[in-house]
């Protein structure tokens, strides 16, 4: 992702500035990475109940809701964004796997 840092940071800043259309650029840049991350965190048993795309969708939606509420005031660039999306996605995948194992 190092070659598109300006466009990602620009999209993030535009979105924080009120341009709701710029979230699409962020989605396109990160969704497949989030799916891969979730895939690595879910075992086969968990994936039969909720696949990695569900986790990635949930993580991105959670990020959007929380960012709109102003919960991430230090979110300034693509590195901040990736770290945050990584944490949200990892936690959701781990929680989903735990929940599915209990069921």
Give the predicted meaning of each segment:
Residues 1-3:
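Intrinsically disordered or compositionally simple regulatory linkers and C-terminal tails
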Residues 40, 68-69, 87-103:
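Arg/Lys-rich amphipathic alpha helix in sigma70-family domain 2
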